[in-house]
């Protein structure tokens, strides 16, 4: 179960998307998130979906893997879909079975919101799947650079981010290990009645917290020992390299925005 | 209880880009009442085999027979509680699984999950704490207030309290001081004999394998390459070298002694005691013949 989760994972590769500059990718994602809200009709949502699939294709990450890894997200998606279907009361009545009434507008909204959600999740996942946590942090640090003037601790924020991203897989592995150890002691979170499953959470979470705190302490010590003193005057080993593809990707995005605006109802 | 692995194959994260093959065509028979050591170089698949022994991992190919229960690749296995009660696993660094308020409650956690009544579970906890050489006061303490070595013992007690028929040990003494190692390994061996347990020891330590096991299996690159008695496995230095393993210290010393003294000892020495005895015998014989 754990090994299929893909949040915060990075799959090394050398597709065009992998080779893009992290600054370009991060800006791309943020602008894209804004652009998504331009869409308001079947055509525009269709364009968004098509564009997203194109990006997935270019990243050479198998769609099946992506969908499989985002299963937990789909539960949320289905939930919101049904919320919209049941609670929107506009447009023509499509279906009426006693206590459930489904309206045209509800169905429309449900589908649109789901597509919007899906597109956002896909694009952001592609960002983390194709960019190593270190490059993401480097990118964010540079992009937030201007805010240093207003005393925003940019370097520290970037560091915190990279540490959390770095430790997601580690904590996942650890969860798996503790889960197995407790399963061997007869406490199984994956089966049995709901009450038993909830009870099985405690033996899992406590050891996990204990080890997470221990890890944090060890990490702090290790950084201290190596003379870490924050971002002041720190030079970079990895240099970022803005290339033609990066400019092109932002141009494409502008084109997409224009198209969405044009087809908007 | 017999455990039989038949042509078992296992891949981690199957059908994802992270897929990684860990086992290929592993066949291994662990007879009831035996003490089997599984040895192998780092990354040879030892720990993966171990997790098949109580169905924490299900084979992606082949099948595993645990007692009467058959777990087959591609077949959904339900209700594995019985299997897991009968096969207890002491994982590497088992102190990571401690969680309860007191040591007593933590040790009772396993047996009570399997429906052992509270008094009985508590009785076992008291008994085990004594057997493991811990002072009885620890029972009321929080497991997180104990020293590393004590935590290890408490965690081991937590597994033993389930009174499994098969005890699987994954490097149970890693990170302990030499005396603690010896005490814990001796305890496992005593339990093995007293309770007629079937014991499986996964270890890096050739010395432990030589001293305690009556059967040895070598894992290499996800294959189970050799199984046999410790005498034959450890006397074949060439074969051990092929799998990047070294014979135990006692045998290395025996070989050096033989080369220096120009005498061949009568038997292979799996323990320090045996080595001392073999050398003494050889020396006596040498004096008699003079």
Role assignments for model-derived ranges:
Chain B
Residues 14, 63-82:
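ABC ATPase NBD Q-loop/coupling interface
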Residues 119-137:
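Conserved ABC ATPase "signature" region
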Residues 163:
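Conserved catalytic motifs of ABC-family nucleotide-binding domains
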Residues 167-170:
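Catalytic Walker B motif of ABC-type/P-loop ATPase nucleotide-binding domains
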Residues 54:
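Helix-to-loop junction immediately C-terminal to a conserved catalytic motif
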Residues 221-222:
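Conserved ABC ATPase "signature" C-loop
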Residues 142-146, 150:
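Conserved ABC ATPase signature
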């Amino acid at each position: 179960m754990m090994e299929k989760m893909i949040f915060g994972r990075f799959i090394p590769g050398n597709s065009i998307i992998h080779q893009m500059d992290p600054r370009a990718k991060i800006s791309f994602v943020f602008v894209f998130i804004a652009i998504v809200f331009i869409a308001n009709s079947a055509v525009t949502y269709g364009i968004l979906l098509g564009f997203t699939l194109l990006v997935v294709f270019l990243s050479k990450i198998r769609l099946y893997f992506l969908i499989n890894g985002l299963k937990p997200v789909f539960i949320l998606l289905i939930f919101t879909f049904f919320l919209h279907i049941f609670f929107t009361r506009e447009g023509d009545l499509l279906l009426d079975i006693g206590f459930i009434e489904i309206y045209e507008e509800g169905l429309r909204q449900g589908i649109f919101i789901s597509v919007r959600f899906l597109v956002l999740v896909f694009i952001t996942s592609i960002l983390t799947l194709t960019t190593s946590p270190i490059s993401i942090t480097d990118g964010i640090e540079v992009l937030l650079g201007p805010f240093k003037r207003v005393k925003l601790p940019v370097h520290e924020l970037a560091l915190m981010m990279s540490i959390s991203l770095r430790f997601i897989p580690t904590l996942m592995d650890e969860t798996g290990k503790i889960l197995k150890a407790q399963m061997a002691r007869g406490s199984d979170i994956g089966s049995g009645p709901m009450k038993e499953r909830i009870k099985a959470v405690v033996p899992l979470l406590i050891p996990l917290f204990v080890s997470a705190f221990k890890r944090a302490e060890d990490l702090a010590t290790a950084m201290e020992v190596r003379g870490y003193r924050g971002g002041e005057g720190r030079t970079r080993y990895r240099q970022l390299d803005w290339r033609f593809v990066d400019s092109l990707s932002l141009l494409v995005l502008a084109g997409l925005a224009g198209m969405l605006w044009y087809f908007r109802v | 209880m017999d455990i039989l692995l038949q042509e078992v194959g296992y891949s981690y994260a199957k059908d994802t880009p992270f897929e990684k093959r860990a086992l290929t065509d592993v066949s291994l028979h662990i007879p009831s009442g035996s003490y089997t050591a599984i040895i192998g170089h780092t990354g040879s698949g030892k720990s993966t085999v171990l997790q098949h022994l109580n169905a924490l991992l299900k084979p992606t190919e082949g099948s595993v027979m645990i007692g009467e229960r058959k777990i087959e690749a591609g077949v959904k296995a339900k209700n594995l509680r019985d299997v897991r009660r009968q096969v207890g696993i002491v994982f590497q660094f088992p102190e990571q699984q401690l969680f309860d308020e007191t040591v007593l409650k933590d040790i009772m956690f396993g047996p009570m999950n399997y429906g052992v009544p509270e008094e009985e579970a508590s009785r076992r906890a008291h008994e085990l704490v004594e057997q493991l050489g811990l002072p009885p006061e620890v029972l009321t303490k929080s497991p997180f207030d104990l020293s590393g070595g004590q935590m290890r013992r408490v965690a081991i007690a937590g597994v033993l309290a389930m009174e499994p028929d098969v005890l699987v040990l994954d490097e149970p003494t890693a990170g302990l001081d030499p005396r603690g190692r010896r005490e814990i390994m001796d305890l496992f061996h005593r339990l093995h004999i007293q309770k007629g347990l079937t014991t499986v020891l996964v270890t890096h330590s050739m010395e432990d394998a030589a001293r305690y096991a009556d059967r040895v299996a070598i894992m290499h690159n996800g294959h189970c390459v050799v199984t046999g008695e410790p005498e034959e496995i450890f006397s074949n230095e060439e074969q051990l070298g092929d799998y990047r393993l070294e014979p135990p210290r006692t045998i290395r010393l025996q070989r050096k002694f033989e080369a220096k003294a120009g005498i061949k000892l009568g038997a292979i020495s799996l323990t320090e005691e045996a080595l001392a005895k073999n050398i003494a015998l050889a020396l006596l014989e040498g004096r008699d013949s003079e």
